[in-house]
Amino acid sequence: MEMDKRMKSLAMTAFFGELNTLDIMALIMSIFKHHPNNTIFSVDKDGQFMIDFEYDNYKASQYLDLTLTPISGNECKTHASSIAEQLACVDIIKEDISEYIKTTPRLKRFIKKYRNRSYTRISRDTEKLKIALAKGIDYEYIKDAC
């Protein structure tokens, strides 16, 4: 399965800054009925722990344009509580994905926009995003414009 351009466009425009990799995993499971092939323990550029999910030829973090660095086995000890917390969240999500989506307003909104926005509108938003990023305009401004 390839990375979905419509989903990435929405994540980077209308939902910029609202989603994390757990949300992306839940959305992929709900919309495409596709489970991750691998779970990667990582940290972001600020050193915050985050789980990334690997699919056939992309990662959940790519939908958010996040650069995550995988952590080593020794580093897992320092992030043990975060790992346990996020793995518990993953289990809750996987247990009943539709209930999780229903009880998470931003994911419910995302799915509604994903299903109801036309391909033309999403393509137009994607073009705006490319132009704005090329000109150095920040994501918050782009989010408000879409």
Swiss-Prot record:
Please state the protein's primary subcellular location.
host cell
Q: Does the keyword Mitochondrion apply?
A: no
Q: Which InterPro entries match?
A: Poxvirus_H7
Keywords, sorted A to Z: Host cytoplasm, Host membrane, Membrane, Transmembrane, Transmembrane helix
Q: Where in the cell is it found?
A: Host membrane; Host cytoplasm
Membrane topology term = Single-pass membrane protein
Residues crossing the lipid bilayer are 10-31
Among the entry's GO cellular component annotations, what is one? host cell membrane
Task: State the conditions that upregulate or repress this gene.
Answer: Expressed in the late phase of the viral replicative cycle.
Keyword Cytoplasm in the entry? The reply is no
* Function as written in the Swiss-Prot or TrEMBL entry: Contributes to the formation of crescents and immature virions (IV). Interacts with phosphatidylinositol-3-phosphate (PI3P) and phosphatidylinositol-4-phosphate (PI4P) lipids in order to form virion membranes. Mechanistically, mediates proper formation of OPG125-hexamers, and hence the honey comb lattice and spherical immature virus.
Q: Give the similarity note.
A: Belongs to the orthopoxvirus OPG112 family.
Q: What is this protein called?
A: Late protein OPG112
